[in-house]
Structure formats: C-alpha cells, structure tokens
Amino acid sequence: MKAGMFYCASQASTATANGERTVTARAIDRHNPIIKDGRRSFTAPCSSGDDYVAPYRQLSKITRVPSSSGDGKSVQVDKGRRSNSGSLMKLISYDVSLARKSFGCVVATPKTPPGSTRYLLGSDPVSLAGSTGQDTVATEESEASAPKRGSSGPVEEKKKSSGSGSDQVVVLRVSLHCHCRGCQGKVKKHLSKMQGVTSFNIDFASKKVTVTGDITPLEVLGCLSKVKNAQFWTPPPPSIPRANPET
C-alpha cells in the first residue's frame, strides 16, 4: 500500500499553517540572545513606565553621552566636573602667584640711596658709622702701635750699649796638644756656637785661649770643659758686695 500526502487548498487550512509558522518563529525569537538584545528592540515593552528598568548598557549610554531629551543629570555631572577642574586650576594659579609675590618680597630688599633722609636718619647703622668709624679704628691702631715702636727702641739701644760697654775678656788654660788639629777644630766649633762671643784667640804654644764678648767666665769655662780640660788662667777676682749707703 502506497502512502500519499494530501494537501488542502482551503483558506482555513492555509491560515492554520501560517499560524503555526508564526508561532514557531516567535518561539525561536524569544530564545535567541541576539534578537533579545536591547539595542535591537526599538519598541518599548508593554509594561508601565514606572516599572520599566533600562538595561545596563542603556544606562551607561545615558550617563556617558548626554542626549537632547531630558538627560539633565548627565549634563549636571559633566558641568560639576568641569567646574571642579576650573576651581582647582584657579587655586593652583593663585598659590603660584602668591608664592612668587612672597619670594619677591623676601629677596628684593629695599635699598636707600646715600642722599636720602632715611639713610641719614639711621636706617642703616653700618652706613652711619661711615668713615668716622674707620678713622677712629685707624687712630686707635696707630696709637697702639706707637708705644710698641717706642718700647722697641730702648731695648735695642740697651743691647747695643750692653754689647759695647759690657764686653769681657776671659783667659783660660786648656790642655791642647801642639800637633792635634782636631782639638783646635773642636774648640773653635764650640766657641763659634756660643752666644755673646765676638772674638777668640787660641795659642797652642802656651795653651792659652782668650775669649772676648758679652759673656761670663763661668759660661766660657763650662763650654770648653765639654771638649778639653780647662781652667782659668788667673783666678777671677772675688765679687765684693757693695756697701749700702743708707746704713
């Protein structure tokens, strides 16, 4: 038995077939995520306007890009941001100008000309001192240096007078050998280093050493005793104490 397909050409049958097709198409659209996207839906839902909640993407669009129809909040946010940035820039510029003014006040010190009344009335104490202070300092230094120079004069004169009038002649007997040149060199070396000695003479034959200068006999004896045995040629006269005229 052969199976056959029968088609009905009536209007009722075609209506039912179209309805079934639309029903299946609606069911597919309802479950399709691409078609369900809010950006593709141009018609508002059938629910009331109070209960309608816009999708997240639409909310982001509203806040980011202000539209012409009733987006006052987004415009206010942008204006607030702009106003905040403007006030911040004004504050920064004001602080910079204030810092410049204060720096200029600190660095730039007012200078008074020498001929002004402030300069003459004592605004600058160092300038008031002027040349008078320098003159007084110079005079004080000259006065202080004058007695020093005057005092050095008598000291030098005393040295000259003592060197000329108080020279003593000391004669010693030194154990010198006639053929020993080393002994003679040692004696000459010690006498030349001795302070106050102006001249000396060595006689090998008589073993006599004569020393002249601002010295004492004991100093010469102590100096030559370091080299050779020495003694006074003639014993020095004993020092006689002077009598006090008041007694």
UniProtKB/Swiss-Prot annotation:
PROSITE patterns: HMA_2. The keyword Cytoplasm applies. Residues 167-235 form the HMA domain. Keywords: Cytoplasm, Metal-binding. Residues 130-166 are annotated as: Disordered. GO terms for cellular component: cytoplasm. It holds the Pfam family HMA. A metal cation binds at residues 180, 183. InterPro entries: HMA_dom (IPR006121), HMA_dom_sf (IPR036163), NAKR1-3 (IPR044526), NAKR2/3 (IPR016578). GO terms for molecular function: metal ion binding. Heavy metal-associated protein involved in salt tolerance. This is Protein SODIUM POTASSIUM ROOT DEFECTIVE 3. It comes from Arabidopsis thaliana (Mouse-ear cress).
